[in-house]
Amino acid sequence: MRTATSILRMNADERGLKYADLTERLIGIFFSIHNELGHGFLESVYEQAFSVVLAENKIFFERQKAIPVWFHGQQVGEFRADLIVDGKVLVELKTGRDIEPAWEKQLLNYLRATEIEVGLLFNFGPNAQFKRYAFENNRKNPRNPRESAGKKSCGGSR
């Protein structure tokens, strides 16, 4: 008998998805948390629950990691990633009725600002929802401040 997990694994492996095993584990963790806690809590509660399960499974993660955004060799902003798992997958957690386009754009911008190529958006709403995103580094604009460090600002405006 094929379970949802085995179908997910087969589909991910057949398509050759980057970090298929890790993303499959994270999706499983998401559903186990949603099944146990349900919906209605703040994002921070689900983030802490995710952290507990990742630690129990000895999966390396960083929580609320500051990620700088660069422009012309200067840092122009930063964001905080909910979770970065094993340095490979950026996880964004939300709580709402449905996944919103703004959340999707947010995650894609986070991927664009990092060397991370895979992102998971988890919505702990009334119906558990997730989306997986891939943004290959060779398709991103340069983010390294040293790549455009030769460009100097005149320091003034017209």
Regions found by a protein language model. Give the residues of each.
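Conserved catalytic cores of phosphodiester-cleaving nucleases, focusing on short active-site segments
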Residues: 38, 61, 81-99, 110
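Phosphate-binding site recognition
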Residues: 2-6, 10-18, 22, 29-37, ...
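A short acidic/basic microdomain associated with nuclease active sites
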Residues: 57-70
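Short, low-complexity, charge-dense intrinsically disordered segments
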Residues: 1-17, 139-158
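Nuclease catalytic cores
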Residues: 19-28, 39-43, 47, 51
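A short, glycine/Asx- and small/polar-enriched loop/turn
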Residues: 75-79
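Short, well-ordered alpha-helices that flank and scaffold nucleotide-derived cofactor binding pockets
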Residues: 52, 56, 112
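Nucleic-acid nuclease catalytic cores
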Residues: 94-145
